Amino acid sequence: RTISFTVGKVLPEPISLVSKMACSGFAASEFLSSIKPEAYKRLGISDYSKRYLVVIAPKAGCVWSGRAPLGGPKSVSGTVALHDSASSYVISHELGHTFGLGHSNFLRCDNAANDGAWSDTCKAVEYGGTVDIMGNIDVTTPLNTYHQWRMGYLDDSQIKQVWQSEVVNLSPSDFANGISAI
């Protein structure tokens, strides 16, 4: 899937907010929903069903740099709010959410084990993944194999489920053939 972006129109005057942008909860989601029609109206765009809107909001005291509603792998539109930032990493990360991608996490086990079942001892650390754009580290590497699979770049035949100790030869995920993920 290829998505191309071109620089679109920029509002000559900012949209005035009657109150400070909400940082969390329903009010933050409501902000994203309400800003979209107003921005497109001012831009003179009536059909925005296949467009992505990037909004740079002023500082509001939020701990996040960007926010976007979760879409799906086949989404063709979305809204991204940037909190006083125009970082390409933040834009890419938030666009990932509009495509249906969650955060890259890792498994942390309190008993010093390298791996284990999800339990009281082994838990996910949100944003813990450090190898792709959906983590909390500014990287330019490809998406991890789980996110590639979610986007449809890898199909089920390229993923092997392993239930016991065995040797699996892995192919790079950008090759068309072979097992690319366990």
Segments (PLM) and residue ranges:
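Active-site-proximal segments of metallohydrolase catalytic domains
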Residues: R1-G78
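Extracellular hydrolytic enzyme modules, especially secreted metalloproteases
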Residues: R51-Y52, P58-I182
